[in-house]
């Protein structure tokens, strides 16, 4: 029987699962030890200028915190049928939203966002599209 690792050193962009940006969570194979988690998931989102999720979507199971590392990000929430836009424009700006928050987003300039989602529950995520 093997022993569980005490630590892991890696790179978020390299360690992402299925080219999604997500690198910690229940979707990481269990043999990856510490990166396989059911309480939290992490995403290193690298987005080109104009890249977007144009179709509003909600994760019905988890709370999400997205922290801007570089660039800018428009996040649009559907609040009772009315769009409400939040713009992350300064490094360290963040938005937190709960389960069921319908949202879409668009990168303004080349953008990097670290997203933390909890708990880590498998859901079908929409594909992103390039702006044009």
Locations of the language-model features?
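Double-stranded beta-helix
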Residues: 3, 7, 104-132
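Short, conserved beta-strand element in jelly-roll/cupin
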Residues: 59-75
